[in-house]
Amino acid sequence: MEPLSHRGLPRLSWIDTLYSNFSYGTDEYDGEGNEEQKGPPEGSETMPYIDESPTMSPQLSARSQGGGDGVSPTPPEGLAPGVEAGKGLEMRKLVLSGFLASEEIYINQLEALLLPMKPLKATATTSQPVLTIQQIETIFYKIQDIYEIHKEFYDNLCPKVQQWDSQVTMGHLFQKLASQLGVYKAFVDNYKVALETAEKCSQSNNQFQKISEELKVKGPKDSKDSHTSVTMEALLYKPIDRVTRSTLVLHDLLKHTPVDHPDYPLLQDALRISQNFLSSINEDIDPRRTAVTTPKGETRQLVKDGFLVEVSESSRKLRHVFLFTDVLLCAKLKKTSAGKHQQYDCKWYIPLADLVFPSPEESEASPQVHPFPDHELEDMKMKISALKSEIQKEKANKGQSRAIERLKKKMFENEFLLLLNSPTIPFRIHNRNGKSYLFLLSSDYERSEWREAIQKLQKKDLQAFVLSSVELQVLTGSCFKLRTVHNIPVTSNKDDDESPGLYGFLHVIVHSAKGFKQSANLYCTLEVDSFGYFVSKAKTRVFRDTAEPKWDEEFEIELEGSQSLRILCYEKCYDKTKVNKDNNEIVDKIMGKGQIQLDPQTVETKNWHTDVIEMNGIKVEFSMKFTSRDMSLKRTPSKKQTGVFGVKISVVTKRERSKVPYIVRQCVEEVEKRGIEEVGIYRISGVATDIQALKAVFDANNKDILLMLSDMDINAIAGTLKLYFRELPEPLLTDRLYPAFMEGIALSDPAAKENCMMHLLRSLPDPNLITFLFLLEHLKRVAEKEPINKMSLHNLATVFGPTLLRPSEVESKAHLTSAADIWSHDVMAQVQVLLYYLQHPPISFAELKRNTLYFSTDV
């Protein structure tokens, strides 16, 4: 199931909140960071993580948002007659093909749900029934009707898509599908009872419990997986999910359908019916979001919930935090034995009337948080990527489902640890009657959302109170039913048919902003989701004393399964009394924030795409383009052999009559002169426009190079050096030797590894070898300053390894099948190769060439 928040569908939160009194496998997370982690149980299917962006607010409706991300009650405009009609119709085909594939999966899921119904009915009239006729009719209510509706729809749509031409019409099929939504209304009304009945029957009948825990869903026709095991509980949820997906497709189809096309009015009508249906469902469901009453007798409602990392007793714990209309409650999911209803355990609560945010001065006095070592976080990411690759290989080779489940469990455990240990941005709250609490977040956007939601509620006339033990028990008990976020935000919780996100490089130019009421010192930061959570990736310069900043700064952001881009606009604080000594304590004022989805169809083009994000009356203009991982593997030789970028290193050194290219020597010299103590040197991106300017100067062999280098930001110089190595026609350690490096680093015997790795260095062409040894010694000198610059040998190997050593384009095509694989394939080994040489005693070019075998006394 794809993330839904960005589509602006009316009141989407109903999908998550709908009768949420059932459990999912990954809800059995261990809230205590120091206890053994639990992954999803075998055979269970988990709901995907739902983004908590503002468009997912329980109070959101299409009419209340007034533009922005919300969708107006009227359908989106189609293509004007004759305007890019051919392109639009081709997009229609792509949209329909994707929907048809997911429709096939849905029909297979319904078939799997219906499969046990007939034998259960057959036993119902015997002396030993598994279920009664009444129980069967309750659990499987309307499933047969829904199956027949969608089977007919699929059978009619499939030939139209397979035999596609520009004149094909299918609007009448969607119109008919929408007209049958009454069946779904009946299903939804019965849904809660169906789940309760299924749960009771599972507890009282072992035979039915076995059936309901492992239903076999047939894989799609083209899939190598013949069957997957899914729980009945998860399958009963599928029809609810399907209504929303069908409505999303109608939006997409209308967007790419010419207004004068015969399908256009039919699709409009289908969308109108679907939206009315969703609205009516929301009206029915909203009352179920209520919990107990407030001290003033008003209904207490859940406003926001989500998973946050709390620092408690000097260790990190994953908590589920619930914000009600008058209280903030921090809870942990209790561990329960199989078959028992899951419950939350309240760790603490603060009435909003007593909740205050500490000032920067007060925060400074509180205990500071020591970040988790970067190299350990990188190791976790490498393990996760390697496990993803293994899972893909197992699936491709039709591996055993148990083996795949074991790998998935390992991946979940590593993702959980990464989620627990990576956040560093403090979010401090204080109970004016006592204790303070500290959460760590990875995103300032998310911290701002929590703060704003609390402050908005605090504007009301709130009263202080103390909950009795019974009241607290009732409130905590309601959390399981009311929660809107069911799973911790890790990628292993995604459905197989859900978009894996984008892997590659996103180039973003932040142009300008307007709409500020007065002049200020302004800058922007960019966040993207990575490994299931958001992280800050780039920051513009501060534009001083202006109401209309024009940054025009370009950034290259690496995407790792990313689906969203966030832009935050800040006013810089120069008042020393307000500046916190904790580097992670951002005290600058957020002026606005916004988020867009990284739609593959929009960004996966070679051209720049310009857009505007609106935030609190502020408009930020930016452009972006995306380069996929497989495209970034391609090294394009320079057309003009007079430059240095994209030109063979042997050609450059011969032309310059040097052993190491001039660009490498100059960049290294400048970094060692004034950047060796720069925090995050080589890891933090330089401004892309500065890097491109330096590239042009080096390519032109301009006489002003040295002057320009001395004035340029040091991160731009470091970025230029990395870009030079990345744009070599082949990697510095060569395509030819790549497989041998991979085999050498995998050797177990230290002596054999030593001889192999040194022999491989000797096999490099002289310009490559001398340049590599020169770079090696430089990186070692950078790592000597690790206490100051925070760049260890491991960090530097992570940055440079995949640049100096990567598979050739031919090998990539031969072995890799997906973007995620391209990212993860051999990355760990590439890092380990460079790390091996960085940790090795100094390597002499002369000694390497003198010895046919290289022996080390350390082995």
Swiss-Prot record:
Modified residues (Phosphoserine): S57
Site (Arginine finger): R683
DH domain span: 91-284
Keywords carried by this UniProt record: Cell projection, GTPase activation, Guanine-nucleotide releasing factor, Phosphoprotein, Synapse
Chief subcellular location: other
Intracellular or extracellular location(s): Cell projection, Dendritic spine; Cell projection, Axon; Synapse
PROSITE patterns referenced in this protein's UniProt entry, alphabetically: C2, DH_1, DH_2, PH_DOMAIN, RHOGAP
Outcome of substituting V859A: Abolishes interaction with DLG4. No effect on synaptic localization
Domain of life of the source: Eukaryota
Record's protein name: Active breakpoint cluster region-related protein
Organism name: Homo sapiens
